[in-house]
Each structure stands twice: as C-alpha cells, then as structure tokens.
Amino acid sequence: MPDPSSTRPAAVPAALPADLPAAPSGPASAAETALHYPLGDSLPQVGCSLEVAPGLRWVRMALPFALDHINLWLLRDRLDGREGWTVVDCGIDDEATRAAWEQVFSHELQGLPVLRVLVTHMHPDHIGLAHWITERWSTADQACRLWISSTDWHAAQMASQGIGGAGGDMAADFFRLHGLVDAAVLAQVRQRRGHYAGMVPQVPARYRRLMDGLDVAIGGTGWRCLAGYGHAPEHISLHSPAQGVLISGDMVLPRVSTNVSVYPMEPEADVLTLFLNSLERLRTLPAGTLVLPSHGRPFRGLQTRIDQLQAHHEARLAEARDACAARPSTAADLLPVLFRRTLDLHQTTFAMGEAVAHVHALWTQGRVTPEDGRDGVRRWRATTPA
C-alpha cells in the first residue's frame, strides 16, 4: 500500500519492502483497485482455514512485525500411499504460532496427518517452524520431509547459526561502507547477530530438493516449481496449470513491494535486476491465474501487478540516479529518497539493503560509478549529468 505521506503518483506503489511495515489500513490505492480479489475481504481466523480452490485451504498466522501476518497453505495430498496434507510455508517459531498450528491440526485436517512441508524460501516467517512441524508429524516408518531449494536450505542453515544476514559485525561493516556511520545504530546492528536464529532456532537436517522446472504431484495435481531470484537466494513459487493457481510466496505481493536487498556475504550482487528478470518469467503465466501471495489477499491480475512493480522500481531507480547526479551519494543518503517515512532499526537494515540494490542495478546499467573515499565510505556518482 502506498505511504500516505508520499507525493508519488498513486499508480506507483511506494517503496515498502515486504519486511517493512505496511501503511495503516485505509482506502485502497489506485494500484490495489486495479487488481481483482475473488474472495473479497474474507480472511481465515487464526487457527482456522478457508477454502480457496478444491483441496487447497488458506491459513493465516500472526507476525510480530508491522507487516503483521503471513499466509500459509494446506493442500490435500496422497503421498506414498498415505492420505494427508502438504503444508506450504510455516510461520516463525514462537509460542503463538505453535498454538495456532495446534488448532489447525486439531480442527482443519479432517483427522489426517501432515505428509510433507514445502517452503518457498529461507526467510524466518516461511521456514521458522519447519523443524517443529516435520518432527511432529514424522513417524518411525515415514518421515515428514522438508521440501525446499538447495540454495535456501543451505542459506537457512548458515543464518540459523548467525552467519551472514542483516546483523552482526559483517553487516555493520557493510552498512558503514555504504554510509551508515552513526555509532549507536552500528552498535545495535552488531548486536543483531542472533536475530534470525531467534525466529529459526533450528533447520531440519534433511530435505528434499525443489528446483526450477520440477513438477511436484500434490493430491494428483501437478505443480511446477518456478525459481525466482533477488528476494531470496533461490525462491520457489508453485504453479498449477490445471487449477490456474500460483502460490507466489513473496515474489508477487498485492499491497507492498517485495524486499530486494544486497547482503554483506555477496556485497556486489545485482539482486534487483535478478528480481525484475524473475518477474518477467512469471508474466508468461495465463492472465486469469489466481495468485496466492504470502502477504495480502489472493488476487487476479498478475500481469497488472508485475507492471506496477516494474514501474515502481523504474521510478525509484530514476530518483536514485538523479540524487547521485546532484552530488555523489551513499546508499544511506538515498534512504530518505527511497523511503519517505521514519524507519526504526529493523526497517533500516532492510532499507539499507534495498538502497544498495538500487545503486547496484544502476551500476550494472552504467548509470552510476562507485567512489571509495578516504573515510572508508562508498559514494555513487552519476556517469552523466542530470
């Protein structure tokens, strides 16, 4: 949803990554009204589910962030001769989410077990409880296995051990390079080394690999894995041609733009270009596809939403480039250009990653060039005058 304080055209959603807070509830924006929501304002209550297609149910769990919920999915399944359910995404590991899942297990599964857990990507709200659900539903004879891309399984293992990510010494040094020089803020970033592990204390030791182009049969229906890049290392969306449904994960969201960040372990990455290229692949799906996003309501209008997201990023790229033409700018200098609202520490870490992503895309395009100063800070200069 656009930032209410933004002066940007309503047709271009404001730059709110999925991990940053959505603006307060209010009238739908022009961008949002261009989409069709077949379920209207219907939402599943916590611990309950809502059918969105035959054999496919919607579960909604709370998150302790300003973006206060995640959508999870139950798919009726038959696996290795056993009747049950496949769960897509899990929520973070906390007592409230476990309690909500227990309600789902008791009242929404028709007395059947969870057979496997598919995770779209390694972010905490998606993989956090994968270890608990798979352990809870595994038996001596049959494992309830985690299915995930290999890249994201390895990334989750590292992050749960405090390696990489948006906190700790490496992150603080990376943010300082890009102009975040406030000592108090950097000290707080250094203390966030265990932030991911607090929501994902454990990742299943074994998994089954999802990869681009793989067809997974769930309940007799084929689901094609579509890899996407830029938001996570190897995000997997699931498309059912027969049902006309796309479980988009975080790749396409109806109200906010997906967070696309550069992280310190891959400091020169051009993740925004990867993300935009991934959206182009999703554009080729049928126009009437029902999109089941991880945040927000199920919607139709996939191509329209992709157009909006691309226009949004093109506008932000132009603004970032103009700022660098006016004077050499750090990524931190660009925060008030790209995010016209007050950011707390949690939001600032994601916003810094996204600001770097935008200047790196401009760098790839030859529109800016880096200049490392004697102060140890990197500034970006436009290659041509404004």
Give the predicted meaning of each segment:
Residues 69-71, 157-162, 258-260, 304-305:
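Short aromatic-enriched loop/helix-cap "lid" or pocket-rim segments at secondary-structure transitions
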Residues 46-110, 237-254:
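Conserved beta-strand hairpin/beta-sheet module of binuclear metal-dependent hydrolase folds
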Residues 65-67, 208-210, 229-232, 386:
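A short catalytic or substrate-binding loop motif that flags glycine-/basic-rich loops and adjacent residues
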Residues 2-38, 318-386:
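C-terminal regulatory/interaction regions
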Residues 82-95, 196-207, 215-217, 222-317:
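Metallo-beta-lactamase
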Residues 52-60, 192-199, 219-221:
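Short Pro/Gly-enriched beta-strand edge/turn motifs at strand-loop
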Residues 120-126, 149, 229-231, 235, ...:
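Histidine-centered divalent metal-coordination motifs
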Residues 96-98, 102-216, 244, 300:
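Active-site HxH/HxHxD metal-binding segment of metal-dependent hydrolases
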